[in-house]
Regions:
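Bacterial N-terminal signal peptides
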Residues: 19-35
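Amphipathic alpha-helical scaffolding segments comprising HEAT/armadillo-like alpha-solenoid repeats
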Residues: 156-164, 188-204, 227-240, 262-274, ...
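Structural detector for internal amphipathic alpha-helices that build alpha-solenoid repeat scaffolds
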Residues: 142-153, 176-192, 213-227, 248-261, ...
C-alpha cells in the first residue's frame, strides 16, 4: 500500500473511503455556505419532514376531521379550515369525495376518524392522517400559517411558541408537525421555547431509542430549557465525548453546552476543539457547526469573538482551515487574510478546502489576497501537486 497520496491523484479515481470522506466535507461546506443567519438551524433542519401538516394546510381550502361511513362517504366531525362556499358543519355528509390517486383512504365504517384536506388547486382530497375530534383545537392552531420562505424571525418565534406544547403530541401528525416546524426554525427562534418544554419530558424523549432521529433538536431544547442540574448533565456528556473523540450528537450537545454553560464552558470547548491539534476532522466539523449556530444567533460581539477563534483555527489546523472560510467571509472578518495567503503558498491546504479559501480571499478585495488567488490558480494550471500521508487523510487527523 502506498504510504502517500498526491493531491492531484485525488481528482482521478480515489478509493471509496476517501471519496466518502471528501463528499462529507463538501456537504458540510455547502451547509455552511447555504445557511444564512435567518434560515433554518443547520444542526437539526435536515431531520425535519419536507412537508408538514402546517404547510399542507396552506395549500388546502378545506380541512375537516371526518369519520368514514362506508361506501366512500364521510361524516364531518369537526371543521378545521372552511371554504365560504361549503357547508362543513358537524354532521355534514361528504358524498364520495374525489381523492388524489394512491391515497390510503379508509373505507370501513368502523375505521378511526381522519383529517381530510381538499387541495386548493384541482379540488382533490388527501388523507393527512388519523385524528380524533378531540384534537380539533390543536389542529386549528396550524391554520393561517405563512410559508417558511415568507417568515421573519419574529414569525418564527411566534410559531415556536405555538407549537412547542405540541411536541410528542399523542396524535402523530400533530407531533410530527411540531417537531418539523421547530427543527427547521432559526436557532434564535428556538430560544422562544424556553419554559415551554419541561426538561423532564426532554430527558424521557432523549432516552427513547425510537425517537433517536429527533435527538438533535431535543438536545438543543434541553440546553435552552436547562437549569443548573441540566447544565451539569450536558457538560458531563460533552466531556465524555471529548475524552473518547466521540461524535454521537456532538454538534447538538456542544450547542446545548454553549447555551446552558455560558462563558465558562465556552472557554473549555474552545481550548478542546480549536486549540488541540489532535482533534479529528469530524470533531472539528461538529464544533464549527455548533459555534457558528451560536454566533449567528448572537450579537455582533459574539460573532466577532467567534470569528477571531476561527481565524486562529487557520493556524492551528492548517490543512483544514477552509472549514471556516465561508463563515469568516459572511461575517466580513478579513483579519485572517494573511494566514490564508500563507496557507495557499505553503500548499498544506486540503484540496477540498481550497475553493472556500479562494472565495474568502476574493471576497476580501484586498490586493495581496487577489494576487495570492491569481498565483494559486496559475500554480494549479501547471499541475503541481502537494503530498499528504494516506493514513492522515483516512483517519481525519490531518495536521
Amino acid at each position: 500500500v502506498r504510504n502517500e497520496i498526491r493531491y492531484a491523484d485525488l481528482a482521478g479515481r480515489p478509493s471509496r473511503v476517501i471519496a466518502g470522506a471528501l463528499a462529507t466535507v463538501l456537504g458540510f461546506l455547502m451547509t455552511l455556505m447555504m445557511s444564512p443567519p435567518a434560515q433554518a438551524c443547520p444542526i437539526c433542519s435536515g431531520t425535519a419532514p419536507k412537508l408538514t401538516l402546517l404547510q399542507k394546510l396552506i395549500n388546502a381550502d378545506r380541512a375537516v376531521i371526518a369519520r368514514p361511513l362506508g361506501g366512500g362517504d364521510f361524516e364531518v366531525l369537526e371543521a378545521i379550515k372552511s371554504s365560504p362556499k361549503e357547508d362543513d358543519r358537524r354532521g355534514t355528509r361528504l358524498r364520495k369525495p374525489k381523492f388524489v390517486p394512491g391515497e390510503d383512504v379508509p373505507t370501513r365504517a368502523d375505521a378511526p376518524s381522519v383529517l381530510l384536506l381538499r387541495q386548493s388547486i384541482g379540488g382533490a382530497w388527501v388523507v393527512a392522517g388519523q385524528m380524533p375530534s378531540s384534537a380539533a383545537p390543536a389542529a386549528r392552531l396550524l391554520v393561517g400559517g405563512k410559508r417558511s420562505t415568507d417568515m421573519t424571525l419574529a414569525d418564527w418565534q411566534a410559531r415556536v411558541v405555538t407549537l412547542a406544547p405540541l411536541l410528542e403530541h399523542p396524535v402523530a401528525v400533530l407531533a410530527e408537525t411540531a417537531y418539523g416546524e421547530i427543527a427547521r426554525s432559526p436557532y434564535a427562534a428556538m430560544r422562544s421555547a424556553r419554559d415551554r418544554v419541561k426538561p423532564a419530558d426532554l430527558r424521557t424523549w432523549l432516552a427513547d431509542p425510537g425517537r433517536a432521529p429527533r435527538r438533535p433538536l431535543y438536545w438543543l431544547l434541553y440546553g435552552i430549557n436547562a437549569g443548573p442540574v441540566e447544565a451539569r448533565d450536558i457538560a458531563a456528556r460533552v466531556d465524555a465525548l471529548g475524552r473518547s473523540n466521540g461524535l454521537t450528537d456532538l454538534s447538538s450537545l456542544l450547542a446545548a453546552d454553549l447555551e446552558a454553560g455560558g462563558s465558562a464552558r465556552r472557554v473549555v470547548l474552545r481550548k478542546r476543539y480549536f486549540e488541540d491539534r489532535s482533534r479529528t476532522l469530524p470533531e472539528l466539523q461538529e464544533a464549527v457547526l455548533a459555534f457558528t449556530v451560536h454566533a449567528d444567533a448572537g450579537d455582533a460581539a459574539l460573532r466577532r469573538d467567534t470569528a477571531a477563534m476561527f481565524g486562529g483555527m487557520v493556524r492551528t489546523h492548517r490543512a483544514l482551515g477552509g472549514l471556516v472560510a465561508a463563515d469568516l467571509a459572511r461575517w466580513q472578518y478579513w483579519e485572517a487574510v494573511p494566514d490564508y495567503i500563507a496557507l495557499l503558498r505553503s500548499r498544506a491546504l486540503h484540496p477540498v478546502m481550497r475553493q472556500p479559501v479562494l472565495d474568502y480571499l476574493t471576497a476580501s478585495g484586498r490586493p495581496d489576497a487577489l494576487a495570492a488567488v491569481a498565483a494559486s490558480e496559475a500554480l494549479r494550471r501547471t499541475g503541481s501537486a502537494a503530498v499528504i500521508p494516506t493514513a492522515a487523510l483516512l483517519s481525519g487527523r490531518i495536521p
